[in-house]
């Protein structure tokens, strides 16, 4: 019995593996939940000896594209399907993202400064898709904990977040202005909260 990521090795491979609570990994409200679940399942299944040597993997997962990718042992197929779907819906990695996180007042002030900057061309501003600011809920923190990725800059309870989606074509201008806005706010000491707002581009755990 082992938790995901802590499976011990067995010389010659295990005779069998039972992937318990498989559906639980898919219930997280995150864009990355399916790919994270598949990665963990494949890592565990890879410790089992080949089927030609009577190795067996049993999963409790309900039928789904993720489960099919495991059964077919074809993560490349799953990745292609997922990428095509995200391209159609305008989600990363088909587009780039920027997350502004911190105290509500600081996030709102940052976005006002950013969008009001004369250095940000109107055509770029019009192409931004902005969601928020909204408070980070318990589901987000549960998902972050499941990733077991510690960070000193990790959001804390009570933080708010604004997400921006933008094409690769305008990414350089957007990220340059994000840096400039952060520098301006820091110089003017406009932060209300104890910490400055956190800006992350293309963060893997923000969706």
Question: Positions of the model-derived regions?
Answer:
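Accessory helical-bundle/CTD segments and flexible terminal tails appended to RecA-like ATPase motors
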Residues: 1-34, 43-207
């Amino acid at each position: 019995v082992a938790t995901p990521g802590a499976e011990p090795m067995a010389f010659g491979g295990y005779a069998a593996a039972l992937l318990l609570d498989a559906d639980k990994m898919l219930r997280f409200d995150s864009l990355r939940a399916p790919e994270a679940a598949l990665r963990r399942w494949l890592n565990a299944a890879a410790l089992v000896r080949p089927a030609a040597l009577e190795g067996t993997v049993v999963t409790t997962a309900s039928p789904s594209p993720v489960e099919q990718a495991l059964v077919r042992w074809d993560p490349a197929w799953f990745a292609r399907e997922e990428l095509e779907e995200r391209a159609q819906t305008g989600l990363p990695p088909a587009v780039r993202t920027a997350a502004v996180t911190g105290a509500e007042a600081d996030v709102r002030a940052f976005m006002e400064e950013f969008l009001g900057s004369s250095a940000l061309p109107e055509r770029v501003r019009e192409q931004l898709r902005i969601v928020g600011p909204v408070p980070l809920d318990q589901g987000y923190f549960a998902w972050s904990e499941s990733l077991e990725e510690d960070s000193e800059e990790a959001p804390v309870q009570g933080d708010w977040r604004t997400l921006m989606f933008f094409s690769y074509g305008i990414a350089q201008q957007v990220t340059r202005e994000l840096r400039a806005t952060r520098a301006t706010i820091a110089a003017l000491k406009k932060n209300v909260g104890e910490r400055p707002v956190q800006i992350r581009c293309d963060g893997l755990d923000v969706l």
